[in-house]
Amino acid sequence: MSYKKVALFDLDGVVFDTEPLYTEFWRAVFERYYPNEPQLATAIKGQTLTWIYERYFADLPDLQNKITEELNAFEHNMQFEYVLGFEDFIVQLHQLNVNTAVVTSSNKQKMQQVYTQHPNFKAYFDHVFTAEDFAKSKPDPYCYLLGASYFGVKPTECVAFEDSINGFKSVTAATMPLVGLATSNPIEVINQYTKVIIPNYLQVDFTDLCAVF
């Protein structure tokens, strides 16, 4: 058994315990504009803002601007709290010389809020991929294949950490080993995509994870 060379992390619900906050934000938005489709707040998890607008608010630039302003204000006041044990886990990866990157559907503007709250955030990762880097949104595998390509390794030499259904589908399509975070979906749902499921990073050993794949 050998270590995986690269660990790729989604952001919300994987690095930060923020996914429930976004669910409430988008639930309020869709209650206003799609009152008969309550499932949409969950269905969009893992998608870029551009994709959401193209899919649900196409040709409505004024409404898009209004939602963007609300989202920016929401994120400006958001507290980005790490998922339990994450900081110790990322240090563990560095000690094992495992390359690390964020693969998020969030945009660069939001990431500035992250960097302001956590000045050491960039030091945890070798690279941060954002929505602007992706030609296609999750569940397409593009973003995770890009992550593997950036480090010059095969997808099977990576391990991806995800929490959303669109994220699970993206990783699976990239033929990449998947660790599911049980922060956003019930275990029985995550089980459809991976049997490697963790509630957080407390007492998680990377070598043990690698031994499973």
Region roles according to the model:
Residues 96-98, 176:
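Short phosphate-binding/catalytic loops that engage adenosine nucleotides
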Residues 29, 47-61, 114, 148:
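Helix-loop "lid/cap" segments that line or gate small-molecule binding pockets
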Residues 24-28, 51-55, 88, 92, ...:
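Alpha-helical elements of Rossmann-like donor-binding domains used by nucleotide-donor carbohydrate transfer enzymes
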